[in-house]
Amino acid sequence: MVTPCPASPGSPAAGAGRRDSHQNLRAPVKKSRRPCLRRKKPLRPLNACSLPGDSGVCDLFESPSSSSDGADSPAVSAARDCSSLLNPAQPLTALDLQTFREYGQSCYDFRKAQENLFHPRESLARQPQVTAESRCKLLSWLLQVHRQFGLSFESLCLTVNTLDRFLLTTPVAADCFQLLGVTCLLIACKQVEVHPPRLKQLLALCGGAFSRQQLCNLECIVLHKLHFSLGAPTINFFLEHFTQWRMEAGQAEVTEALEAQTLARGVAELSLTDYAFTTYTPSLMAICCLALADGLLQHQHEMDLRLGEHPEATLQDCLGKLQTLVSINSSSLPRILPPQIWERCSLPQSWQ
C-alpha cells in the first residue's frame, strides 16, 4: 500500500493531503448479507360458519353405521355455504404416463406390501370415551376444515390414518379428541402440503380451547407413539394408480377415467368418516369407489374388480356399504362434487 508523504499540520497542503489520503485509503465496505425477509402475508380469514356445538365439531354427513333414518343431519344445511367443491382430477401429462410406465408397477407393489402394516383395524377397541359417533363428528368437521384450506386429498387420507393409528395405541379423553384431530391434520399437511396451515389458524378453529404448547406437545406424543412411521399407503394413491392403469391399458377413455376418479374421491371422502369402512384396506376401497363411480356415471367400461386380487365376498360387501352410504348422502354429494360430475350421475330410484 502506498503511504502519502507527511505534511505539516497547519499547511493547506496538509489538509488537502488528509482529504486525498482519506479518499485514496478508504476501503470498500461490504454490505452485510442479511437475509431478505419478506413481509408476512396476513392470515387468510376463514369463512365463519354457524355450526351447532361450542367446540365447532359438527356432523356433516350421515353414516350407515350410526343411528340415522337416512335424512340429512341439521349441520348439512348449516354448512352448505361453507363447503367448497372437490377439485376435479387434473389431466395427466405425457410425463405422468411415462413415469407410470417405468415406475408405476414397482410403486404399486411396494405400497401394496406396506398396506397391512399401516392399516388400523378396530381403532376404537381401547377407547372408553371415544365412540364411532364422535369419530364421525370429528372427521366431518375436519373435512370442512380440509376444504376451507384447499388441501389435497392425500393430506386428508393421511390425517385419518394417523388419527386411527394413534387411537390404537393410546386412550384419548373426549375433551382432547378435537385437539388430536387438529394435530393429525397438521402432521399430515407437513408431509405433503407446500404451505401447511399455521398453528394460529388451527387453534382459532378450535375456538381458543387449546394452547399452542398443548398442540406442540401432542404432536410430539403422536410422532413418538407412531415411531415416526408416517408414510402410509392411502386411498388417494391407489385411486391414481388404478386410473392411470385403466388409461394405459386402454380399458377406459381419458375423460371417463378422470370423471370416475373425481367421483370416487367424493365417495371415498364420505367413507373416511364412517367407522364401518376402517375394516377395508385402502386398495380395496379405491377399487370399490371406482367401480361405484363407473356405475353412477353409466360408463361402458366398468372397473375390473379383480385388479387388486381381493376376495369376491369382501368386494361385494364393501360395494353394498358404499351404495348405502351414497343413498343416505344423496342430497349432500352435490355440495362436495363439481357440478359437471354430479349432473352426469344417475342414481337408481331406490336410492333417492
From Swiss-Prot:
Subcellular location: Cytoplasm; Nucleus, Nucleolus
UniProt KW keywords: Cell cycle, Cell division, Cilium biogenesis/degradation, Cyclin, Cytoplasm, Nucleus, Phosphoprotein
Tissues and organs where the protein is expressed, per its UniProt entry: Present in respiratory cells (at protein level). Expressed in multiciliated tissue in brain and fallopian tube (at protein level). Highly expressed in oocytes.
Sequence segments annotated as region (Disordered): 1-40
Compositional bias annotation for Basic residues: 28-40
One GO cellular component, as annotated: cytoplasm
Record-linked Pfam families: Cyclin_C (PF02984), Cyclin_N (PF00134)
One Gene Ontology biological process: mitotic cell cycle
Chain positions with Phosphoserine modification: S83
SMART domains tied to this protein: CYCLIN, Cyclin_C
Family: Belongs to the cyclin family.
Name the UniProt record assigns to this protein: Cyclin-O
Phylogenetic placement of the source organism: Eukaryota, Metazoa, Chordata, Craniata, Vertebrata
